[in-house]
């Protein structure tokens, strides 16, 4: 909920409205929930589901659940529509998904130094 004071500035009268939470906060919350998701499989009658792994906790009503593991996007998988990451350009300094540590999936990577010479369209102006 967000509120704003009226013109007087004394906040004796405010207008409030419902608003979406910050996008980063929502994403962080979903990431935490996803990391705790429980893999399940359908029961024999198909009316319910149970934990897919013996000895793991049962899913609660508020847990995120999933049936199938995610595909391995590191390798070519035409059925999943993944071209893999081999041969792609990565950023050695980035810690994000474009960084070599993540994109190369532990396979290692080669570095190449590229030097580009370009015309800068610079002009010299005598000033003093």
Curated annotation (Swiss-Prot):
GO terms for molecular function: cytokine activity; frizzled binding. Its main location: secreted. Pfam families: wnt (PF00110). InterPro entries: Wnt, Wnt_C. Keywords: Developmental protein, Disulfide bond, Extracellular matrix, Glycoprotein, Lipoprotein, Secreted, Wnt signaling pathway. GO terms for biological process: canonical Wnt signaling pathway; cell fate commitment; neuron differentiation. It is found in: Secreted, Extracellular space, Extracellular matrix; Secreted. GO terms for cellular component: extracellular space. Disulfide bonds join 3-16, 5-11, 90-105, 127-128. The keyword Protein transport does not apply. Glycans are attached at residue 48. A lipid is attached at residue 8 (O-palmitoleoyl serine). Belongs to the Wnt family. This is Protein Wnt-2b-B. It comes from Xenopus laevis (African clawed frog). The gene is wnt2b-b.
